[in-house]
A protein has these predicted regions:
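N-terminal lobe of the biotin/lipoate ligase/transferase fold
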Residues: 2-15, 22-26
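Phosphate-handling active-site elements
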Residues: 10-19, 45-65
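A generic structural signal for short beta-strands and their flanking turns/coil linkers
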Residues: 16-18, 68, 77, 99
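Short pre-catalytic strand/loop immediately N-terminal to key active-site residues, enriched for Gly-Thr
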Residues: 18-31, 176
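DPxDG-like acidic metal-binding loop motif
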Residues: 30-56, 72
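Glycine/threonine-rich beta-strand-loop-alpha-helix active-site module
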Residues: 51-91
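Conserved, helical-rich catalytic subdomain that frames metal- and/or nucleotide-binding sites
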Residues: 75-76, 80-176
Length: 176
């Protein structure tokens, strides 16, 4: 949060002193982008408070150097991501008929640990077609959603097998 403040104050001298009260409800090490969302929302708040008039694209550029996934939280909507997760295209995804269950085991996975085990495999056929799926508006089809994969899963589950066990139990219970 402070890095965002410093960075934006350097770019926009009209940003004055601020008093920040911060309450965090996102668990650490859960892969939910807590620090990145904090950075993005600090930039959004400074933009509003000091009436900077920055677009989402400009705000995304401001926070991009602080973390590859920071721009995602500026958009605050499901997105198709390319590159290192910083090139974004908003997509329509209706999950209104589904229940979301979040389970945070005792183990935690740092961003460095998660990214450290990823071996680029090239773009999958599903990912090549994801932009087309957006156009066809079929991303809400559960059979399509079930074909998407999480690139972090293999690495994280090797280090923390309890995560693989939790996932399997959810799938056995009918999760998508």
């Amino acid at each position: 949060i402070y890095k965002v403040y410093q960075r934006m104050q350097a770019h926009f001298p009209q940003i004055g002193n601020v008093k920040i009260t911060f309450k965090k409800n996102i668990p650490f090490g859960a892969g939910l982008g807590g620090g990145s969302s904090d950075a993005a929302h600090m930039a959004i708040a400074l933009n509003e408070i000091f009436q900077l008039g920055l677009t989402k694209e400009q705000l995304a550029e401001e926070v991009r150097p602080l973390g590859a996934d920071c721009p995602f939280f500026v958009y605050n909507t499901p997105c198709y991501a390319e590159g290192i997760g910083d090139k974004l295209m908003p997509i329509s995804l209706d999950l209104s008929g589904l229940r979301l269950v979040m389970i945070k085991p005792h183990c935690g996975v740092s961003t460095k640990e998660a990214y450290g085990g990823i071996i680029p495999k090239g773009t999958s056929k599903v990912l090549n077609n994801l932009k087309d799926l957006k156009v066809l508006n079929v991303l809400n089809d559960l059979t399509i959603l079930s074909t998407l994969t999480n690139d972090f899963e293999e690495t994280v589950c090797k280090v923390h097998p309890e995560i693989a066990e939790i996932k399997q139990r959810l799938l056995d219970a009918g999760a998508v």
